Amino acid sequence: MAAAAFPFCAAQEVTRSAQIPGLRPYKVDLEYMPRAEKDSVRMVAELWRGYVESFTSSSVDEARRRSFWVDGSPDYLQEFDDGNLLYASFRENRILDIRKLGGGTYELIAATFSKLPGEEYDNWVEAVLRVCVKAVASGNGGKNNPFRLCNWLDAEFPSLTKTIFKGIEYYCVPGCGVPKKAASGLATFVTRFINEYAPEFQGPLRYVVAPSVDQCERLSGILFNAYSNPLMSSASGKNSDRMFYGRTFGTDIVLSNYWDDRHDVALLLIKSSWPKALPMIQEGIAAYHGGYMDLSYSDIKASLRRYLASKKDLDLSNDDNFYDLSIPVSGKDGVTVAVVPLEGIIGAAIVEYTIVQQGRSKVKNLLGCQNYSDIFKVLGIPSADINDFIRGIL
């Protein structure tokens, strides 16, 4: 792990040896650590453990869960993977190490291990995660834990170079500059998209850029991820040299290795303005207007057409039949660039049909749908005709 890439590394006070009582072993030397430091390390560990356990407790509501974070900020790690890596019942979360970064700030590294039966799953590491922990006012007469969590990306912001361009705040790793042409094109796209779908968006839009997929993963706090499929990994599967990373965090941050990741910018703006909309429609709007990495919507649509032509028995009248499927997407050269969830591409085709046949204002009616069948009620499509309708609009 290069110190240049991670500015906190040089300031870390690394301690090693004994186990903290009641927790999994990790290398923090309690024997020689000052009493105040011991207490701080214990509280950091207790905070993380309590937060993880809150996902299996029916008595913990969302407000309580947000209280574990600085200023109640979004849990970026949960946003990153829908919580599956951290909190699923067939996974175990363990603390690997806690390091003091300086002041009241700590780095906590945790890992998820499989709990599936069978020798092949013994000590199988699925992911290694890093979060930042900061001391805040404890409240309640000092009885509350004074530490709060924040995503590692929050910890990295001070080390990134900030450039403001027409309402977009770019944050770049050292040695990485903003191409004016790309920034100008994205700014125009953002302005038009906000006017169309998210006029209440207050901004600013924070756009974090790192040149490689590996750097993006590390900025996000994901140090290791065993999976390679787009539903469970930190980046979509791909087999070309066009390596791509794009994620949205909270309501105002995009992290990407592309300067003009219009798909994820559109997705962020839609999620921030229409948080209760169906993911299919959110993703569909993002794909229709923003494409996917350097692929246009027409490339994505052509890939969907080819896929469905080879899957004539796939019944599209019920989203349970395809919500967990992904398909290869390629450009005009026929080279597969990525493996993309089918749900969002079907959503994009529905969005296109709605705009062309019924007008842009009708798309906002789609954003208000509560379930898959509601989409077709808005469009006036009988339930018996859904499968033929989707195949027909391609």
Task: Give, region by region, the residue ranges found by the protein language model.
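Juxtacatalytic substrate-recognition/specificity segment
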Residues: 160-278, 295
